[in-house]
Amino acid sequence: MNEKTVKQEKELSAARDTFASTLFNEGARMEKERVLNALPEEFARLHRSGAFHIHDLDGWNLVNNCSTPLPEYVLHPEHLRTKTPGGRIAELVEQFKEMICTVQHRQSGGVGSCNFDREMAEALVAAGVEPTAENATAFGEQATLLFTWLSTQRLRYARENFYVTLNMGLDTSSWGRIVTHESIAAFAALPVDYTRPNLVFKVKGEINGRAGSPNYDLFLAACDCTTRKMIPTYLLMDAEPNRACDPFKINIMGCRTRVYANRNGEAGSVGRGNIAALSLNLPRIALETKELEKFFKLLKARMNAAKRVLLLRAEAIRKSPFAAEMAESGVWSAKNVEEMCRQGTYSIGFIGLAETVEILGGGKVQSDPRARELARRILEVMRETTDGYADETGLNFSLLASAGEGISGRFPKMDAELFPDAECWKKGFYTNSFHVPVDSGVGVFEKLAYEGPFHRFANGGSISYVELREAPIGNPECVADIVLDATSQGVPYLGINYPLDICNVCGTRGTFDACPHCGSKNVKRIRRVSGYLETLDEFSVGKKAEERNRLANSGNHRE
């Protein structure tokens, strides 16, 4: 694929308002209305009014959210047709690509690979491909083609890139190390606006997190790539919420989804996924009550409504031929849709905890100990409640620290209509999950120290970000320091952000309003939204407002 072809394909697939995408959008809008009209009036009203948000309504009675396919579904070294090592490598990567297409069109959310390094390594060994320097180069070339395809082709709903998350870093075999090294190197070498897939580097002290450990060099390579492209993000296996997990059985799906504990089978992420999710508007509950006792009473009522919605959805999915096809295809360890619904997770999420605490008179969470204690108590009650639902139903209910990409702007807009005198909505967005407000300006380590203890409540998935003033290019030690501190603070999953601007005229990169080299204001701005990187013009209204308010977490990280 030559440079001209790549550019043409990227320009063609970047046009979101195509016939196919327009047709899909209209169909999705109509399906959402149909679902809401069919729901019990109480639940439809809560969604329409912005009291909570039912995610992926257009797939209500059709498909699950996200999954991590079984390795044997993805790669089939026994079916390779070519005899040369390079041909076999290319075929295996093509099989992986075919899996992405198939699974992404069978569900509403992202697809993950739990151990991309180990799974690909085992397939390469089974295919008889030796871990030579020549074959390592061949794999790197195929990784480059795969990542280019994921970054440039908007094949999801004819308008979006596929949501793919590759977890890696723990395999110490020859091929496992090659897969990790070449994947990171391939991603680092691609243009900075090539932002797919999301690479997640698993950090485990004795394997790669300490000097002298077998894969420490790969950890440093990952840190160096992060200084240039904000990817990889880091799954911290020695952090308190992950410590009891088998590091080879847990991974991130999508931008933060965590699937591990299992009441109805073996614990782990592989061959499982999230069935459905719903997010609560916490500030709305505070605005409606203004007093703690009433707040907790209404919180439990809203969570109970959320539970009933998710149970209705599970019942609808049990009757879906599309869900049955997914269950019976070998993607999941479940053999039928009933077992799939028992093995999967049901997540109740939330956004706006910082605003909620302030409405209730607790002050600023980043500076007031009373506010932090109230935030902790709210999370504790929510986790106790979801655990109670799991006990009651026998299903895997969990608490999700929602990203809130779409709802971060939707919720405050609707609250403004109901509470025009409230201050919380005036900035145009609500803060992600339990995060420190983006305009707090607290230091890196202070932010991690505040958010760290809250992660243990969010067993359905969570992430902490730190926002640097600029890309720490050439300083991977900066990233390593932050990763190690986040681990000690109990952060299970970490992302490192910074503004990344690219001049569309001359290619200069940095942080600027106008290009310092040629003066052009034709600038592409790449930022992290939720878990994935996007160009700023693709952000939702709420996330654009959030980005305008972001301040760097400066003052206490190594420059």
Please provide the spans of the model-predicted regions.
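Glycine-centered flexibility sites
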Residues: 349-352, 460, 531, 542
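Long insertion/accessory domains within large nucleic-acid-processing enzymes
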Residues: 519-559
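Conserved catalytic cores of very large enzyme subunits
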Residues: 2-342, 363, 368-525, 534, ...
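Contiguous, well-ordered alpha-helical segments that form the cores/surfaces of helical PPI scaffolds
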Residues: 118, 346-359, 380
